[in-house]
């Protein structure tokens, strides 16, 4: 499973403040909230929280893409995230 391999890599490095780890945690929260919202369609507070987390992850991914394009490509490949649109 992708999640376990990424956790083992990040745990070995013990860099919990790294951009990759933060994006990984936000992605897990997003997936958990998405499955919650499929059951509870009118939970507007959770929808707001999901939008906030999506924005935070998008900003972190933009930062990573600007600083290190190779690490960005690897991360979106591992987490199965679509590449962000450029304006």
Curated annotation (Swiss-Prot):
UniProtKB keywords: Chloroplast, Plastid, Ribonucleoprotein, Ribosomal protein
* Record-linked CDD domains: Ribosomal_S15p_S13e
Q: Which Gene3D superfamilies match?
A: S15/NS1, RNA-binding (1.10.287.10)
Answer whether the UniProt record assigns the keyword Plastid to this protein.
yes
Query: Would I find Ribonucleoprotein among this entry's keywords?
Result: yes
* A GO term from the CC aspect: ribonucleoprotein complex
* One Gene Ontology term of the molecular function aspect: structural constituent of ribosome
One of the protein's GO biological processes:
translation
SMART domains referenced in this protein's UniProt entry, alphabetically: Ribosomal_S15
| Endpoints of the signal sequence | none
Instruction: List the InterPro entries.
Output: Ribosomal_uS15 (IPR000589), Ribosomal_uS15_bac-type (IPR005290), uS15_NS1_RNA-bd_sf (IPR009068)
Q: Localized where?
A: Plastid, Chloroplast
Family to which this protein belongs: Belongs to the universal ribosomal protein uS15 family.
Instruction: Describe its partners and assembly state.
Output: Part of the 30S ribosomal subunit.
This protein is called what?
A: Small ribosomal subunit protein uS15c
């Amino acid at each position: 499973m992708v999640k376990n391999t990424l956790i083992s890599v990040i745990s070995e490095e013990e860099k919990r403040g790294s951009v990759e780890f933060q994006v990984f945690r936000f992605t897990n929260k997003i997936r958990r909230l998405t499955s919650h919202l499929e059951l509870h369609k009118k939970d507007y507070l959770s929808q707001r929280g999901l939008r906030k987390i999506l924005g935070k992850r998008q900003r972190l991914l933009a930062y990573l893409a600007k600083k290190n394009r190779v690490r960005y490509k690897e991360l979106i490949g591992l987490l199965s995230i679509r590449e962000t649109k450029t304006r």
